Amino acid sequence: MSLTRLNIEAFRNIQFAQLIPAPGINVIYGQNGSGKTSILEAIYFLGMGRSFRSHLSQRVINNDNDKLTLFATLNLARGDSKIGLRRFRSGETEVKIDGEKVKRLSTLAETLPIQVITPESFSLLFEGPKSRRQFIDWGAFHADPQFYGAWTNVRRVLKQRNQLLRNGAVYTHIQFWDQEFVRYAEQVTEIRNHYVDSLNGLLKGIIGEFLPSVDVKVSFTRGWDSKTDFAELLENQYSRDLATGHTVSGPHKADLRLRVGNLPAQDALSRGQLKLLVCALRIAQGKLLKQQIDKHSIYLVDDLPSELDAQHRQLLLKQLTDTGAQVFVTAIDPAAIVDSLHTPPNRMFHVEQGRVTVVE
């Protein structure tokens, strides 16, 4: 799978741009503020309906416009597919796939699986468990068609349960919701656990490429003691949940644990090593997607030279090339990317003040 055409209109400082990307490695270069990261962001927005730069997501629409428009043609195994998205200043989003209106943004994510390696994506290890749950759930969503419905139900029931707790409901009023909560929580947990097991099968070798002298153990924690019956736990923890006004244990507390020896990876590794570990996780996740559903991810790699030294840039780009996936990578100086590739990039684009030109 690859993007064969991308139109960007009124997105950040890009008034209009049309790109004809190539399969393989696409290098996008330009000075800071030129708009090169906005191209990656537009691709992500088209696949997720939101920005990967969360702190800037309210300013995606160009100041002179009342809406942004993104359009892409995808080359899929079954033929070409066309995706279009409009976002209005009101917050309304309109999505079409092959001319048909789409109501759920999850349909976008299913159609256009995207992996991101940016300065922000390193929060996967530097911050709390939320980003690691999202990492697991990205894979579980693509691997198992039952996951989205089960997780949607977990969130629905959890919201209702927490509202009852805040209202001081007696346990008999919560018990009905707990029966549903347990059923969907166990379904979500089983899918997540199976996914992490599958990921582990690939991870060891890939981590070994990036960090050959480090033994990283990866495990999944479900959000409650695996030896404890979840229904009994919810009943036994009712008083505690009532006091806090929310559900203390459950699949919404799950985590992906990465350890080196007896220490969390965050404490045992340097910041540079942690970045390499995140790269390994992203590569493994993309490879597993290809194995499970025979679909490539599209990789978006932002500002690579500032994040990794020359040796590790070369290693990451080799790993990305070996996946066979389409890759978009940005840099201020294109030589920092080109010199790290074993073969010339498939296509290069120069961005200046929001204007994009292909470099022959």
UniProtKB/Swiss-Prot annotation:
GO molecular function, one term: single-stranded DNA binding
Residues holding ATP: G30, Q31, N32, G33, S34, G35, K36, T37
Cross-referenced InterPro entries: DNA-binding_RecF (IPR001238), DNA-binding_RecF_CS (IPR018078), P-loop_NTPase (IPR027417), RecF/RecN/SMC_N (IPR003395), RecF_2 (IPR042174)
SUPFAM superfamilies cross-referenced by the UniProt entry: P-loop containing nucleoside triphosphate hydrolases
Organism: Shewanella sp. (strain W3-18-1)
NCBIfam families the UniProt entry points to: recf
Localization of this protein: Cytoplasm
Stated name of the protein: DNA replication and repair protein RecF
Gene Ontology terms: biological process: DNA replication; DNA synthesis involved in DNA repair; double-strand break repair; SOS response
Task of the protein: The RecF protein is involved in DNA metabolism; it is required for DNA replication and normal SOS inducibility. RecF binds preferentially to single-stranded, linear DNA. It also seems to bind ATP.
Pfam families in the record: SMC_N
Family: Belongs to the RecF family.
GO cellular component: cytoplasm
Keywords: ATP-binding, Cytoplasm, DNA damage, DNA repair, DNA replication, DNA-binding, Nucleotide-binding, SOS response
Gene symbol of the encoding locus: recF
Disulfide bond sites: none
Origin: domain of life: Bacteria
